[in-house]
Amino acid sequence: MTGTHTDIPLFPLGTVLFPGGLLSLKIFEQRYLEMAKGCMRAGTPFGVCLIREGAEVGAPATHEALGCLARITQWDMQQLGLLQLVAQGGERFRVRATRVRADGLILADIEILAEQADTPTPEKFRACRQLLERIVTQHGERLFAKPFLLDSSAWVAARLAEVLPLPAATRQKLLELDDSQQRLAIIQRLLLQSALLAQSASSPERSGQS
């Protein structure tokens, strides 16, 4: 998708979705069940934005202006009224205007953000790449969608931002950066400060939201 789009449904969450990332959701609120049904029927995405104030359930939450589109790739409803789905992150976007439907679903006018051309992962970020390689080897498709693009600066930066124990606000700041190598530089600095680059990869969990 490119350009501007209207009436994109938003799902404010307590997590940050990055392009190419996987997001598991358990949906039970009627507004989001209807949203998911509409997206699956039309093959269209919904938008994920980090919550600034409020909660995932109940009254519409205040959310960040920059988010990531999500496309549903898998779904299952083994229990009536509880939809489980997996979505994959697409393009980043900026919210230009919103309105709230009677059922509480937020609809947004958005602008798709242009991405800089991807570049190979520079040698100076070799330690970041090696850390992610260990995580991929141990956890693979449980955390990430194929293909595993370890030579891509954008892919390495996004996947590390997802799985490392970072505050949601830090993840949001990383999402807002246009330059993937700048993301990697910040991530590497955070890793060095926490000594994680000197440790073996642990067992990270990608946080799914309900």
Task: Show the residue positions of the predicted features.
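N-terminal low-complexity, acidic/polar interaction/targeting segments
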Residues: 1-210
